[in-house]
Amino acid sequence: MTQTSKSVAEAFERASYPIPGHGPRDIQVLKEALDAYDGGLSSDKYGEGAIIEPFQERMARMLGKPAAVFFPSGTMAQQIALRIWCDAAGSKKVAYHPLSHLELHEKDGVRELHHLEPILIGDRSRPVVLADLQQLEEDVACVLLELPQREIGGQLPAYEELVKMSAYCREKGIRLHLDGARLFECLPHYGKTAAEICELFDSVYVSFYKGIGGVAGAILAGDLELTEPSTIWKRRHGGDLISLYPYILSAEYYMDRRLPLMDRYRREAQELAALYNECHAVSTTPIVPPTNMFHVRVNMPKERLEPIIVAVVEETGFGFTSYLREEKDGGCMFEVSIGDRYAELPKDQLREAFRALDRRLNPSAGRQL
């Protein structure tokens, strides 16, 4: 890590009012959750017991699937889902977006561990649509769709497009898997329940540490054709730990607390994105976020932007981001995810912080937000 990137992170750490997220990812996250439960509660053991089984049943009902299996990580859960669907079809080919988590962040796990052959579909700048599936020149066992698409700012396809893609895959005998790491965050936009969205898919993965803000863990849901072999693969991957209750209880605790707030987070993200879009040389992707997340892009090189952000943090106390990522065209970007923090921010001071940011980005303008 360079010295300049440290300065942004350090400024964010010193900020009186960090803007994104729920709060620090410290051990208080787990402690708060565990304090809500009776300390005499028996723990789960190797995938069985009074904690894990009721939670899996609850998630299966919530997602509208016959069964669900708790995993320590989504990386494990999704690779296993794709492997099972490929084995069932007698094919090694799967299709997903070029900016899928499997392609960018898993060290080629589907290739190296499972010897699958990913086919990248769609444009890097937008979600997958029906036309992308229709243009596939090879037969595939499974298509993976991510809702929302994190690496392009949380963009979502239209619900009608999802319905068309689901119908197309079923007609062609292709399994459709949902990377729903942030599924709950997109439900207010669609105006649908989790079960209504998941009905379009053969299998679904959901994360418990992103918008929900738990410690870690994931659920994989589908019919028994998927879930029964997934427990075997979970053991093969080393994921069948003697106990997973710290993950499960924190998932349950924060899910109950934050699922009712997802629409609020979305509206707050839209409010914040509007403030960013009023600033000189700044734009968000999407312009109007459909979920609680978006990307901020600044048309300025990192060596110029970084001291500006640090100065505004020190002047106003508001922390915008803990990092900047340089883009190939010379600009910078960072991701924003709205959580519990935003509602507690003093909004008049927040607007003044954005005025200060705008002034420093464009000293000659001096316009008002």
Specify the residue positions occupied by each region the protein language model found.
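Conserved C-terminal alpha-helix-loop-beta "cap" of PLP-dependent enzymes
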Residues: 2-3, 281-369
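PLP-dependent aminotransferase-like
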Residues: 86-141
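Hydrophobic beta-strand scaffold residues
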Residues: 117-118, 176-178, 320
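Short glycine-enriched loops at secondary-structure junctions
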Residues: 97-102, 236-237, 326
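Active-site C-terminal subdomain of aminotransferase-like
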Residues: 151, 156, 199-280, 284-291, ...
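Conserved N-terminal alpha-helix of the aminotransferase class I/II PLP-enzyme fold
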Residues: 5, 18-73, 87, 98-103, ...
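Active-site phosphate-binding strand-loop segment of PLP-dependent enzymes
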Residues: 126-180
